[in-house]
């Protein structure tokens, strides 16, 4: 399908560049998910009935980037009407109106996270922690506006735990967002990524794991 080289998404990102970034990262992660490890997908057939905007995926969190990359893979496959499997060719026609909420400080750590911002990051300032230290600050209204813009534009992923540590309770901010914006909420459970990848999700830690 021809893509207008000048068209931009709701955050001003050029869609042709965005598509290229998603493809390159998808190429790398597809091999890691489906060849170095194996990934089992359950329930993706429900994606076919979702609207194109106003959907919030609420997931647990095991790595900074592998989790969200896996969801992008599943959404790309669904865009090509493939459910519960991710054929390699679906990388060539990714879903472009997907966004993920991430801590601003995480997205500034190195060139790869900065590139991943182009894939659809909605970077926000954490109100409880920064640079490894506890903080206590008010929510930035601009962050709420950006999240609202993402939801109005497409599908949005959030990790309410706000950390990759296991068994941490989700932050109340997600509940407030749901009450205010009233999106279609889709719960997601992931597993196996902590065993397979390091904390960032950029480096493989072990092979042959089952990812869910």
Predicted segments, located by residue:
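A transmembrane-helix-recognition feature enriched in membrane-embedded lipid enzymes
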Residues: 1-42, 70, 110-119
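Catalytic core of membrane glycerolipid acyltransferases/transacylases, capturing the structured
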Residues: 51-135
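Short amphipathic alpha-helical segments and helix-helix/interface helices
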Residues: 26-30, 88-90, 113, 147, ...
